[in-house]
Amino acid sequence: MTTIVSVRRKGHVVIGGDGQATLGNTVMKGNVRKVRRLYNDKVIAGFAGGTADAFTLFELFERKLEVHQGHLVKAAVELAKDWRTDRMLRRLEALLAVANESDSLIITGNGDVIQPENDLIAIGSGGPYAQSAARALLENTELGAREIVEKALGIAGDICIYTNQFHTIEELTSKAKDPENV
């Protein structure tokens, strides 16, 4: 249970997440780092789901990035294949949001690798709130990617009981894909 949101805008891609870890109905920790830099700081990734499961997936994904020389899409597809077919990995319950300078992806345990519309990702229990907020800000303001992520996480944290106001945010310079990103 968490909120991870990613926005790509005006030459930047940002992934941010809250820091709350819960066990049942109890907050166990409030400062978990659910967003990390991978592959020599060229990839940023965030997770929603079980913490131990997510750390396992981070390690596996980083290995795939090494094998595929940092090619994000290939590494994501290979991780998703393994995740879906390996008996032990299938039990892992988490979602990953990953991005590099040119691509943003969601990787699921069902074997899905999804490139979202408008390079907006929001996953976890607070994902729908963060996505709604980020989309409104993207469509109606000139705010930068980082500010949109900060505001979307704040709104999700105000609404979702499994999301707090401790945020970890990572940012990369992005390659432009459309006029909005120039």
UniProtKB/Swiss-Prot annotation:
It is an enzyme of class 3 (hydrolase). One of its GO terms (biological process) is proteolysis involved in protein catabolic process. Its main location: cytoplasm. The active site is at 2. Keywords: Allosteric enzyme, Cytoplasm, Hydrolase, Metal-binding, Protease, Sodium, Stress response, Threonine protease. The keyword Amino-acid biosynthesis does not apply. It catalyses: ATP-dependent cleavage of peptide bonds with broad specificity. Allosterically activated by HslU binding. Na(+) binds at residues 157, 160, 163. One of its GO terms (molecular function) is threonine-type endopeptidase activity. Its EC number is 3.4.25.2. It is found in: Cytoplasm. The keyword Metal-binding applies. InterPro entries: ATP-dep_Prtase_HsIV_su (IPR022281), Ntn_hydrolases_N (IPR029055), Proteasome_sua/b (IPR001353), Proteasome_suB-type (IPR023333). It holds the Pfam family Proteasome. A double ring-shaped homohexamer of HslV is capped on each side by a ring-shaped HslU homohexamer. The assembly of the HslU/HslV complex is dependent on binding of ATP. Protease subunit of a proteasome-like degradation complex believed to be a general protein degrading machinery. Belongs to the peptidase T1B family. HslV subfamily. This is ATP-dependent protease subunit HslV.
